Regions:
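N-terminal intrinsically disordered, cationic/polar leader segments
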Residues: 2-80
Length: 80
């Protein structure tokens, strides 16, 4: 039997370090006008720049525009 449900593969696409596109299940937290954090699938992505702007967001994807990227960190969540 063929199952035609769409299963999105999480990915991070970085375009010239000015636009970051993230796909997959995640939770977005805006920490300040300069930084945001995405968490999901056991990982945390931290983005810091001079200006961090959420330009587009829907259930499956977020597009973040940054100016003068200062920090882009992907780390595994600590499971306690």
């Amino acid at each position: 039997m063929f199952n035609n449900h769409l299963h999105l593969t999480p990915f991070i696409h970085i375009d010239d370090f000015q636009q970051i596109r993230i796909n997959g299940p995640f939770e977005l937290t805006v920490l300040s006008p300069h930084s945001c954090q995405l968490s999901g699938n056991g990982y945390i992505l931290i983005i810091e720049s001079e200006n961090t702007l959420i330009s587009s967001m829907n259930v499956e994807e977020v597009i973040i525009n940054v100016q003068e990227l200062k920090r882009l960190e992907l780390r595994k969540m600590e499971i306690v």
